Amino acid sequence: MTPYIGSDAIKPYTELLKQKGKDLFVVLRTANKTASELQDLLSGSRLVHMAAADIVNRQSEKMITRSGYSQVAVVGPANVADVLKKLRARYKHFFILIDGYDYANANAKNCSYGFDQLGHGAIACANAGILSAWNPDLSDGRDYVRCAEEAAERMKKNLLRYVTIL
C-alpha cells in the first residue's frame, strides 16, 4: 500500500487487521533508480519518504503485537543503506521488508541495517536474482528449482555475515 495519499489510506484497514490478525505492508522508499525524484524530496525539514514514515508510525504505534512489531509494516530499499539505518533507529517497532536485494548497489551489508540488534524485525527480498538464477549456458533447463534454491542459500549466507540472529 502507498502512504502517499495520506493517512486515510491506512486507517480503514487497521480495525480489520486487528480482527483478522493480518499485517499490512506500506511502501515508504523504493529501490528503483528514479525513486529519489519524488521520495527523496524535502517536505519541510524531512525527506518525503520520512514524512510518509511519520504518517505510518501514527497508525502502527497502535498496533504493536507481542513480538514488539506492528501489524502495519513498511517496505524499504536494499540499495539505500541510510534509509534502512534511519527507519530502524527511529521506528523500533516497524517490521521492515527490505526490497531489492538483487538491485544495483544493494548488498547484504546494506540489508543488515534494517534488522534490529537481535537479528529480527526485517526480511530481505530478492526477486529476479532468485527467479532468474537458472543459467542456460550451464544447464539443460531441468534444474531451475535447484538453481533458485542455491541462489537463495547464497543470499542467506551473505546476510548471515552481517546479521547475527539471537
Segments predicted by a language model, with ranges:
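Alpha-helical scaffolding segments of alpha/beta enzyme cores, especially the outer helices
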Residues: 12-15, 51, 86, 110-113, ...
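Surface-exposed amphipathic alpha-helices with a cationic face
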Residues: 14-18, 57-61, 85-91, 156, ...
